[in-house]
């Protein structure tokens, strides 16, 4: 009789765990009262999204072109300058389309740094992916992607880089 009761309790716990898991799954994929799925909601701009965008640009081999912001060049490769890499995140359409400019977002390094909600010296950088980092006089900008690493689109012939924070003379971090 004890064995039967133990089996019933075990079955009840298993059923309760299954129902709880199903409820969590349902709640995590549909936002309340909107019917919007999480994947659609993730289109919102986030610091993590900016870091992922920069890493994708690095992996895809974007080329450097002064004044460009992520559109395809004549070779079919995306191109940007340093601030254009960040600006392209704000205006992204999809992997196969050119960027659609939205001048409500900051385009230049100075505008991006001035638009920050928080800033500090590089030696105080929080462990927050997607911060932007700048050098002296806001002459260059990159994206902090975690683990002490920055992605930036550097200059002609160098293109995208993935390097440690001390590697380029970064002086400040900024949270957009």
Question: PLM ranges: what are they?
Answer:
Residues 1-4:
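Short, Lys/Arg-enriched N-terminal segments with co-localized hydrophobic residues
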Residues 7-19:
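Bacterial N-terminal signal peptides that target proteins for export
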Residues 18-29:
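Bacterial N-terminal signal peptides
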Residues 27, 82, 91, 129-133:
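Generic recognition of cysteine residues
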Residues 27-44:
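Sec-dependent signal peptide cleavage junction
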Residues 40-98, 137, 151-153:
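N-terminal capping segments
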Residues 46-48, 87, 95-168:
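...with weaker cross-activation on analogous glycine-rich loops/strands in unrelated enzymes
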Residues 171-176:
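Low-complexity, Gly/Ser/Thr/Pro-rich intrinsically disordered linker/tail segments
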């Amino acid at each position: 009789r004890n064995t039967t009761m133990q089996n019933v309790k075990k079955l009840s716990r298993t059923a309760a765990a299954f129902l709880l898991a199903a409820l969590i799954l349902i709640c995590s994929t549909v936002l309340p009262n909107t019917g919007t799925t999480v994947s659609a909601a993730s289109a919102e701009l986030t610091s993590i999204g900016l870091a992922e965008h920069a890493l994708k640009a690095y992996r895809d081999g974007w080329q450097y072109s002064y004044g460009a912001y992520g559109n395809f060049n004549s070779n079919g490769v995306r191109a940007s300058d340093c601030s254009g890499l960040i600006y392209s995140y704000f205006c992204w359409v999809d992997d196969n389309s050119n960027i659609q400019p939205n001048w409500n977002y900051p385009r230049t390094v100075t505008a991006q740094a001035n638009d920050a909600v928080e800033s500090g010296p590089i030696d105080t950088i929080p462990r927050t992916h997607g911060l932007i980092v700048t050098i002296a006089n806001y002459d260059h900008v990159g994206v902090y992607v975690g683990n002490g690493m920055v992605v930036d689109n550097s200059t002609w012939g160098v293109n995208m880089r993935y390097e440690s924070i001390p590697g380029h003379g970064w002086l400040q971090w900024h949270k957009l």
